[in-house]
């Protein structure tokens, strides 16, 4: 539902077209979800059918991680799979801090989800910056200087998820994702809370308004709560 609210409810037609392109150019799961959203908007199907179509694909590709029926799955695994850049794979390489010697390495493990460790402190923006470029344990074969791990996306990035399980970090309104040519600024669009197989979310629109959604209490609608910046960080990180 959060992806649907991002795609359709909070913004206008032009933004829907942008999200359509983002979904279709990401992977089969988001492309299928987009098709389901379009059918719902035209009154030809339901949001539940859109969800079930993606769930069937997930189960077919990995029945262990994504079981059918009423059995739950890992939220982290679900997010990783849903956002994995199947068509636009990022580049991961090691670069020497002294002679700039570069080694390309397997980038299949680089997705659009960053896990924030329990020991992390600072803002999400700072943590993400360190994640995208940090010191490795290896040294350069040419000059024995330390090698830095650098992640760069082949195209300007449009969607990224962060898994925050600790409250010692500060949620950032914007973050920067480095591309091959330039960095792209991404704005915080939503927060998902989960526990006991129940999900709620907060959507942040382009004006910084926070909208709350809970399928049990708000049904198919979202309610406007506050402005981003007026809600304390502890309250933002809990629901």
Predicted regions mapped to residue ranges:
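UBL (ubiquitin/ubiquitin-like) substrate-recognition surfaces
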Residues: 1-239
């Amino acid at each position: 539902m959060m992806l649907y609210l991002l795609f359709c409810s909070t913004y206008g037609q032009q933004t829907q077209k942008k999200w359509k392109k983002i979904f279709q150019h990401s992977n089969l799961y988001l492309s299928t979800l987009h098709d389901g959203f379009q059918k719902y908007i035209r009154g030809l199907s339901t949001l539940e059918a859109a969800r079930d179509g993606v769930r069937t694909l997930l189960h077919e590709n990995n029945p262990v991680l994504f079981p059918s029926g009423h059995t739950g799955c890992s939220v982290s695994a679900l997010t990783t799979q849903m956002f994995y850049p199947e068509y636009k794979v990022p580049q991961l390489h090691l670069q020497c801090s002294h002679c700039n010697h570069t080694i390309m390495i397997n980038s299949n493990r680089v997705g659009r989800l960053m896990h924030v460790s329990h020991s992390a402190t600072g803002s999400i923006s700072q943590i993400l910056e360190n994640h995208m470029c940090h010191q490795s344990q290896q040294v350069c074969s040419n000059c024995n200087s330390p090698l830095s791990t650098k992640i760069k996306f082949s195209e300007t990035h449009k969607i990224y998820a962060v898994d925050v399980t600790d409250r010692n970090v500060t949620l950032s309104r914007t973050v920067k994702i480095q591309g091959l040519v330039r960095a792209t600024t991404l704005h915080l669009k939503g927060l998902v809370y989960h526990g006991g197989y129940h999900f709620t979310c907060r959507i942040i629109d382009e004006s910084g308004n926070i909208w709350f959604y809970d399928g049990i209490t708000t049904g198919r609608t979202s309610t406007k709560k506050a402005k981003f910046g007026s809600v304390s960080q502890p309250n933002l990180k809990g629901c």
